[in-house]
Amino acid sequence: KNGEDTICYAFSYYYAELACARMLVELNQTMLPEGELLPAQEEAILKRVDQIQQQEGLMLDELQRKAVLESVRNSILILTGGPGTGKTTTINTIIRYFEGEGLDLYLAAPTGRAAKRMTEATGYEARTIHRMLELSGAMPESGKKASFERNEDNPLEADVIIVDEMSMVDIHLFQSLLKAVSPGTRLILVGDVNQLPSVGPGQVLADLIASEVFPVVCLQKIFRQAQESDIVVNAHRINKGEQIALTNKSRDFFFLERNSVPVIYKHMVQLIGEMLPKYVKASPFDIQVLTPMRKGSLGVETLNGVLQSCLNPPSEGKKEVQLGDTLFREGDKVMQIKNNYQLEWEVVSRYGIPIDKGVGIFNGDMGIIREIDEYAQTVLVEYDEQRRVTYTYPQMEEVELAYAITIHKSQGSQYKTVIIPMLMDYKIMLTNKYLREINAKFYLCKKMNDGSDKSDIR
């Protein structure tokens, strides 16, 4: 019971959430014998922060400095804030502080793309949560299921664990993570609570903050560089329920009104294939089309067919195969649409020699079809970090074209350029949680129905 409401759980979700709560209570303790920082200790920490700022050329505001203090004081810290509020700068400062203390740090994120961005932003190796927990594949012949090697019996050997993009983490993955964290380890969870919740069950980050049990630092100041981006400014306007700013003078946020769906198709293809690669120096595969819906004239299914025919048309020597309702072609941009803990991947050198291997391809991983073998009936897909997976034809039911994807599937990703085609039919989907944080340019194509008003974009 929740007041007058009755809440129903699947058993597995309920017990996973209960287990997480119990483990969090056990982990949530002050890291200081005295319980609080003494004035001299706080002064010493802030002095060290000042040194880091000077060395790294940073300028932290009071909330960012508070986040560093809380990370020293507590075993669990939640760091949240919208785009442009300095989460990455704060993470970098925390890393440099604990590094200076001689502590071992692990950095992780839910997806390969997010982990790669974290590595680039911090200069410190970040891994996917699955890889950090050492996912091992299933062995059907022995009845062994896929599992994590790191758990309560074999915890992570880290003094500090920082997990980014926590809004993407579902309750089951969070439970597996907590099992591998031993008491005395600092756990710092970072994310934007205003982003969409995870695709899997639970809204872990939002629930942790709402519990008011754990220390939370919410960054609010939009820094100067971010203030110059209309994307960031409009993201915060939408979160506040305010009208977005539309101006032809913007460097990164554009609203293009077109009067019919065919015209939108034509203009999108021109943008992706010709105009944007020149303007933002991005290949067509760096440009992502996002849409709120799967069905309809501007839904994922229709748009993928339109964009595939224009951006990766058939040609002599380019193999293709029809599997179910989808035509796959060498060179296609694709996405894995469900977690598969058994799929094996490998990274090969330029000479074709395997240099790394592992298991597991996960919901939202995006790649390129490199080869279709009609004789063996297999499809070779290359994912981030040059991971190559060979799918059998039946396994390709877990893969779909990704020239256009749903906004929900884009969660936690960043792209150089995004195009969002919209109809007023999607009005019910235009909530503030559907705005994404994008790395560079943002284009919005919208077909206005009679009697509609531009304020509807709010």
Locate predicted features.
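Conserved nucleotide-binding/hydrolysis modules and their immediate coupling elements
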Residues: 56, 170, 305-435, 439, ...
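Conserved helicase motor core of P-loop NTPases
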Residues: 193-359
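Conserved alpha-helical scaffold flanking the Walker A/P-loop in AAA+ ATPase domains
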Residues: 139-157
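N-terminal pre-P-loop "Q-motif" helix
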Residues: 57-73
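Conserved lysine of the Walker
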Residues: 87
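Interdomain "pre-motor" coupling segment immediately N-terminal to P-loop NTPase/helicase cores
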Residues: 1-44
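Conserved helicase motor core of SF1/SF2 NTP-dependent helicases
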Residues: 93, 97, 101-103, 109-117, ...
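Hydrophobic anchor at the beta1->P-loop junction of P-loop NTPases
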Residues: 79, 107
